[in-house]
Amino acid sequence: RLRRNDFELIEDPAIKPLDQIDFAQLLDFDSKVITTERRDFMHKWLQHHHTLVYYDHNYVRGYGTIRQCHDGYQVGPLLAENREIAHKLFVNLIQKADPQAHIFLDVPEINPSALVLMEFLRMQQTSINARMSLNNATIIESSMIYGVATFTIS
């Protein structure tokens, strides 16, 4: 948990709004991480939230989404080829948040690089969540998951 004011925008021409990217390329990148076909989920999830894509040399190399939640803003999913890209996406995504609002990110423990990033960002653990899947969703590349899409019902 942190606040937007803790970070300045990171300028990078590879960071683009979702509407400047071919959706098929985004789906292709997403399929490198998880085997479940997520076209419908992605279309519905992304159309109602702010999404940035890291698009470099004609390839999607990461993307992230931020949305308002009950207690601030939630980032997720945050998928990237490496920690540097995840960091740039995260810092640019949170610029959409109200300056004093809390920022949340659900980080999977299966990616040690994501935990290092959270430490670098000085985020504090506020809760622990269990991840469950239906229909045997398989993660192919856990090293690319820096934040998961979560929907909290309380």
Question: Each predicted region: which residue ranges?
Answer:
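Intrinsically disordered, low-complexity, positively biased terminal segments
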Residues: 16-154
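Conserved N-terminal entry element of GNAT/NAT acetyltransferase domains
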Residues: 2-20
